[in-house]
Amino acid sequence: MVRRTKEEAQETRAQIIEAAERAFYKRGVARTTLADIAELAGVTRGAIYWHFNNKAELVQALLDSLHETHDHLARASESEDELDPLGCMRKLLLQVFNELVLDARTRRINEILHHKCEFTDDMCEIRQQRQSAVLDCHKGITLALANAVRRGQLPGELDVERAAVAMFAYVDGLIGRWLLLPDSVDLLGDVEKWVDTGLDMLRLSPALRK
């Protein structure tokens, strides 16, 4: 009985997340209410509050779902024991771009995060949440780049802090550009070129040296 109740709770949580995704995609995060999400999910607002305190936690759940399939590669590139951290980063970026183009749900969630998540005054918690996510991502990229430097895959004089900012900006900007103008960039056909462009920047740019 306990197991069944737990499974039902997990199913309800998944329903709520799916409904939030649909509502955010249609209306934007700021214009969507928890009542809108409850109606789409076929649950009460009380059921939503059982799983999530506010919209910020729902946005975080969507963001977490994006990271699930990439987590093992991210952890590998950040590990000091990994022999090929730059190779793991390359595989990770290829996976990120391929999923963006080929998986409709991944595309919708990225669309929400990039173009439908307004940082208005009443959305300050979501702004803080996104700031924290960017800083966490920066920390992970910095660790991966430092590992690649130690393994001789990147220049010893690479400024890993500055390089991490540049790499995040490159990837995030390319995703945002493709979402806005998908026909202007062959992200799938040229995916290896786009990834290697970013990695070449790390290897070759004098401006990223100490």
Swiss-Prot record:
Molecular function per GO: DNA-binding transcription factor activity; transcription cis-regulatory region binding
Any single Pfam family the record assigns to this protein: TetR_C_2
DNA-binding region: 33-52
PROSITE patterns in the cross-refs: HTH_TETR_1, HTH_TETR_2
UniProt-listed SUPFAM superfamilies: Homeodomain-like, Tetracyclin repressor-like, C-terminal domain
Record key words, sorted: DNA-binding, Repressor, Transcription, Transcription regulation
Domain HTH tetR-type per the UniProt entry, residue ranges: 10-70
Role according to the record: Probable regulatory protein for the ttgABC efflux pump operon. May function as a repressor.
Record-given protein name: Probable HTH-type transcriptional regulator TtgR
Native organism: Pseudomonas putida (strain ATCC 47054 / DSM 6125 / CFBP 8728 / NCIMB 11950 / KT2440)
Gene expressing this chain: ttgR
